[in-house]
């Protein structure tokens, strides 16, 4: 089992969700986060004064999948989230030792 975390632009959430759902993945956790990468924020003008916005609003989504779905899910996320501009985001894939469904006690693949 793998955990796929993706940090994307908020405007791309619906597209990414649809792409993942089309693969038959039904579980998804979404977080509203703030951060910066290489772009290190940006400056904005407000009432004639320039302000530096260090942390940009992003969406982080997390999905747990079996090994066979890792590459299709990564492709669905990249295809749906890519604009070709700085700030499109990152994807992190990590190994997962176990998953436990609290309600039933099911473990592993049965708990996904």
Walk through the language-model features, giving the residues of each.
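Positively charged, small/polar-rich N-terminal and surface patches that mediate targeting and assembly
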Residues: 1-112
